[in-house]
Amino acid sequence: MALVLCALPASGMAAEGAQLVDRYCSGCHQPQAGEGSWSRISAQRKTPEGWDMTIARMGIMHGVQVPGEDRRELVKYLADSRGLAPQESAPQRALIERRLNRVESFDHPTFQQMCARCHTGGRVLLQRRTEEDWAKLVNFHVGQYQTLEFQSNARDRDWLGLALDDIVPWLGDNFSVQSDAWDSWQQATPVDPTGRFQMWGSWPGQGAFVAAVEIEAAEGDDAYRMSVDGHFLDGRELQGQGMATLFTGYEWRAQLSLDGQSLLQVLDFSQDMPSGRVFDADDEAMGMQVTLLPEAQETSIEAVLPRGLKAGERTTLAVIGTGLDADALEVGEGLEVIEVLKQENGLLLLEVAVDGSATPGWRALRQADATLERKLAVYDRVDRLEISPDFAVARVGAEQTPAVSGVFRVEGYLEGEGQQPIALGEVPVNWSVSPWDETAEQDGDVTFAGVMDKASGIFSPSGAGPNPERKYDTNNAGNLRVSATARGQSEAVSDDAQLIVTVQRWNNPPLR
């Protein structure tokens, strides 16, 4: 089950969307007073993925059959008319972007135990309902999942009583279908995503890149076509194209082909600089955060790649902004521009030499009145490393259910006495794995669970199924310590994270 991301036909307008609800849904969800109003449906608001999952559940549980094109139009109509405002979805962007290796926390003392033990709490908090409808959702869970009250964190309490008397009022107060944010967003000027942008990020195993992105309208309701033309910082080209749909006025969902690889893209277009994630639909851990800067005429400096330059070395520095001019750019003490590799309105690619005796610390970039501070630093050593995620889950795989990789990145920090740490971005490290504990060592988890790429921090799990070479013929699960050690330093600097390699997950909705 997954949200189908593609251009919608022109028939996906509001009136025709309402007609589709009447056709496929109103047999059970009765029309109510007011235009475009139905029982239960009008008591809820959700993300595009949330509405798509609802339609899928109607098919699985009630036999509702909605053809693909009509399903796409239904999702578009429901997300546009009953979606979430940007500030409502903002706390859960990580879940929408399928950044799954994270630990949730909530401002309710028992919500984790009551609701977020079978699915993420974010799946709940990306919905808005009336208090009456939240109560109906609780009752649905008890009826549909009949062992719910006998499970751990339920059998030790009056689960249903607590859910109805405590959780439902909290959800009704804090996640109501009525909100000022939604009312304001419905009155906001529609977002126009067309134009030219600079997009940048760091592709796992490939490296940092910058690319020009052209977005133009395509045939269909809020449908767009995009092209990507860029380079990795080591000079390799990056080319691609894709199709996208804009839901709820800002929720960008695209199918991309980058260098021949099929990827999905999720962006929030409500921001001045849209941002989000690009990832592999079959291996969602294999993804990258990206930011887009729209083209403009005024001078601005918004970002640099990389963020840390080592003293005594030459490197390619990407400066991203608008109205950039290499001749007018000041790069800071101890830095010398050796060659301008590329110059565009929104991008400078510079070969920069760093003096071997340059003082470690921040460097400000300046051009006329535009300044970028505390985003670029010079360092002579790395004082501290920080791996993210610090806890991750990878999954063994087979042809029918592909493996889920363990993808790690590391940031370096320069720490001066009495000063705030200076973030250096990604720095060169060597990656390795070792047993997390004595049991993992005795079971040979390092041997059987998979392989860590020393250079990239990408862990590739082993194949699924029983392994006759293991104790009890068990599968290739493991409990591993992931270590990153800074390269080229006289004193070892490292950090550790934990990686659980486990079995496949068979039910993978877009919102876990």
Which residues make up each language-model segment?
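Gly/Gly-Pro-rich "capping" loops immediately C-terminal to redox-active cysteine motifs
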Residues: 30-61, 120-145
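Beta-strand/beta-sandwich contexts
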Residues: 293-328, 370-422
